[in-house]
């Protein structure tokens, strides 16, 4: 049996302010720092050890990974960062308050933008300062790889090549793998692993800072998955994610 641990970064400053974040590189809030440290402590207490870790190129995920590994005394293990693990790009919504956007466009429309599978938010224009083409961390990307907006379907298509080429082979080799990423990049992976339908994915919310453990067969079929946390706390945190468009 193989094990894989997924972790959404701790609460970010923009999570706290209830803004659409996407590829905007914002840091962790004080609560987010505490969540990351707590996740590391829980993983250590439950006997988890990792051989390798993967994360995005956004500092809220990187910092979460560092805090987890520091708490586990595993700062020395190899860690790899890749843009394909980034959060879904929220296009022209990035930086906007979710509840205020729902008031302006209607809760149903914003829910479609946030949680539907194949409908992206309104796109940026290439001259928008939020467009990642001017960011040096993406200088090696092809023009067609730089998003103006993304649906979850787009995020799945972006994420899965790195999963198949890099992360999944490490798990198959027997390495103990930690992936610290984002709500929607992890939703993309969970959708793939659990064969979640396009219509059901709207109901899947991943809370910040709570480790999600997958037990997998040798051919990477899930046996079961579970959060390392009190079920009531996990349910409450998931509801908070779902309710972000409400005041």
Curated annotation (Swiss-Prot):
The active site is at residues 9, 87. Keywords: Gluconeogenesis, Glycolysis, Isomerase. InterPro entries: His_Pase_superF_clade-1, His_PPase_superfam, PG/BPGM_mutase_AS, Phosphogly_mut1. Pathway: Carbohydrate degradation; glycolysis; pyruvate from D-glyceraldehyde 3-phosphate: step 3/5. Its EC number is 5.4.2.11. One of its GO terms (biological process) is gluconeogenesis. SUPFAM superfamilies: Phosphoglycerate mutase-like. One of its GO terms (molecular function) is phosphoglycerate mutase activity. The record marks 182 as: Transition state stabilizer. NCBIfam families: pgm_1 (TIGR01258), PRK14115.1 (NF010713). Belongs to the phosphoglycerate mutase family. BPG-dependent PGAM subfamily. Catalyzes the interconversion of 2-phosphoglycerate and 3-phosphoglycerate. Homodimer. PANTHER family: PHOSPHOGLYCERATE MUTASE (PTHR11931). This is 2,3-bisphosphoglycerate-dependent phosphoglycerate mutase.
